[in-house]
From Swiss-Prot:
Domain of life: Bacteria
Family note: Belongs to the Smg family.
Gene: smg
A Pfam family this chain is assigned to: DUF494
InterPro entries: Smg (IPR007456)
Gene source species: Colwellia psychrerythraea (strain 34H / ATCC BAA-681)
Designated name of the protein: Protein Smg homolog
PANTHER family reported for this sequence: PROTEIN SMG
Length: 157
């Protein structure tokens, strides 16, 4: 499912393509690209739920809390998000790339992935997808993109 999400994000979402509107055409294209139909439906459902997370009435855990609050991860979350991943999320909060709401959206979307192994690179992509889909987070999205691409280039000597 994550491969499909990556494909969709790189091919359609970042390019703001209109193909995302017609699920049937998109499903046909993804099937022709070699993806299995059940995984396609899971990925599309994942994206729909990401959009639905912006409705805070339906998701009470996305209500505003004080800036001094500390996130306590569940055992299930800690199994999927290792210590470096949780540290990266905390770092992004400290540099104001993520706020309480977007952090919870990221954790929610990570936990909905159908996977037992989740890498730091996977986490970065999920965070990019969340920030891209939240209105008003364009600056945070750009900031994270800069962090990711600067990290990949390495230090200059």
């Amino acid at each position: 499912m994550f491969d499909i999400l990556m494909y969709l994000f790189e091919t359609y979402i970042q390019n703001e393509s209109e193909a995302m509107v017609d699920h049937e055409l998109l499903t046909d294209e993804l099937t022709r690209a070699g993806f299995h139909q059940d995984e396609i439906y899971k990925a599309l459902n994942w994206l729909e739920k990401l959009t639905a997370l912006q409705d805070t009435d339906a998701y009470p855990y996305l209500t505003r809390v004080g800036s001094k609050s500390v996130r306590i991860y569940t055992s299930e979350e800690m199994q999927l998000l290792d210590t470096p991943s949780r540290g990266f999320i905390l770092f992004l909060e400290q540099v104001n790339v993520l706020d309480f709401t977007t952090r919870e959206m990221v954790i929610d979307r990570v936990m909905e992935l159908d996977t037992k192994y989740f890498s730091m690179d996977d986490l970065k992509w999920v965070i990019l997808m969340v920030l891209f889909n939240v209105p008003g987070k364009e600056s945070a999205y750009s900031q994270l993109e800069d962090l990711i691409f600067e990290e990949q280039e390495g230090p200059l000597h």
